[in-house]
């Protein structure tokens, strides 16, 4: 019997049958011998199991042999952890089995828990608020970008990307909410998605520093403001209040704003720029256009009295960052 098949058989038995489930005595003895040997070779696991055994009776070990075997095999995978969720070989990525003693059944059972790296991921993603995008998409874009750049020799293949991310990492490391920062208008001239992925990577870098970040898809946000459903409109307006105050704000596709009336543009585009500048909050944006953000903002508000002022605000809030790299990530 293969080890994988062995695990599934004993795991199923231990989960579906109470207490001392019925298997052939010879198989049970072999299983118990295997568990003892595995515990002897795994000091850390032994230190977790011994206190649980002491809580039980003389039958606890025998009752728990199936679940102990399952735990030890799972723990062996964790011992050789690649320290990256994207390389975790488990079917349930980011989760591990944790043994606990069940007094009623006099056996040790396994609870499924998040591993260290999954906990770190969940904590970081929880700091992306408000979020008008998929948090999982943000994580995957970050992982794709940073994993590639960390490989030896790859940073020289994407020099602009590496430089920009390094600059942001330094800012995040010494971030002071009371200090005024200038953000970036990130434009990638040789890739349609690299600028967005870089901004997503930047988002995650800030959250890893325990800094709250808002991530807004501009089309979705402005579409929400003019949605026929008042509940959707109300939610977009609540999000706007968060956008004003969040320490770091990401605006994806700032040029891609749906057809809205002048009042909406005045209140929520010009108003956002005013509030972010007044509060000294750092803001980043991407656009799918070749023009700079100063001219972009003017083009959106040129028919309003605030057009020139909004253009000046954009120039103060954003520094132009052009990424000339070709996207050579796999």
Predicted segments with their positions:
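Conserved alpha-helical scaffold flanking the Walker A/P-loop in AAA+ ATPase domains
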Residues: 170-174, 228-249, 267, 271-275
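Long, basic/Gly/Ser/Thr-rich N-terminal segments
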Residues: 1-116
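Walker B catalytic acidic pair
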Residues: 218, 252-254
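Charged, amphipathic alpha-helical linker segments immediately N-terminal to NTP-binding catalytic cores
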Residues: 105-168
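Loop/turn-to-beta-strand initiation segments
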Residues: 211-212, 245-249, 277-285
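Short glycine-rich substrate-engagement loop in P-loop NTPases that contacts/grips substrate
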Residues: 156-166, 184-199, 203-245
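Pre-Walker A segment
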Residues: 151-152, 172-180
């Amino acid at each position: 019997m293969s080890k994988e098949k062995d695990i599934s058989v004993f795991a199923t038995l231990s989960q579906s049958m109470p207490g001392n489930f019925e298997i052939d005595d010879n198989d049970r003895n072999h299983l118990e011998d295997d568990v003892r040997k595995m515990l002897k070779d795994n000091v850390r696991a032994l230190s977790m199991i011994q206190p649980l055994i002491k809580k039980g009776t003389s039958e606890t070990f025998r009752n728990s042999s199936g679940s102990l075997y399952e735990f030890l095999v799972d723990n062996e995978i964790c011992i050789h952890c690649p320290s990256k969720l994207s390389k975790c070989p488990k079917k349930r990525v980011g989760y591990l089995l944790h043994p606990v003693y069940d007094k009623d059944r006099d056996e040790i059972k396994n609870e499924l828990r998040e591993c260290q790296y999954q906990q770190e991921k969940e904590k970081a993603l929880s700091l992306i608020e408000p979020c008008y995008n998929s948090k999982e998409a943000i994580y995957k874009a970050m992982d794709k970008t940073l994993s590639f750049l960390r490989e030896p020799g790859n940073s020289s293949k994407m020099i602009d990307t590496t430089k920009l991310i390094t600059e942001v990492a330094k800012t995040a490391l010494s971030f002071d909410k009371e200090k005024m920062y200038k953000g970036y208008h990130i434009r990638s001239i040789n890739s349609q998605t690299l600028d967005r992925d870089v901004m997503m990577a930047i988002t995650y870098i800030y959250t890893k520093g325990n800094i709250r970040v808002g991530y807004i898809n501009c089309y979705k946000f402005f579409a929400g403001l003019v949605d026929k459903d008042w509940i959707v409109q109300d939610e977009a307006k609540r999000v706007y209040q968060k956008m004003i105050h969040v320490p770091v704000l990401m605006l994806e596709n700032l040029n891609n704003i749906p057809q809205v009336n002048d009042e909406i543009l005045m209140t929520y585009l010009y108003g956002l720029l005013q509030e972010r500048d007044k509060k000294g909050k750092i803001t980043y944006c991407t656009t799918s256009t070749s023009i700079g953000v100063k001219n972009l903002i003017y083009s959106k508000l040129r028919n309003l009295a605030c057009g020139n002022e909004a253009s000046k605000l954009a120039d103060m809030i954003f520094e132009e960052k052009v990424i000339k790299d070709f996207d050579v990530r796999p």
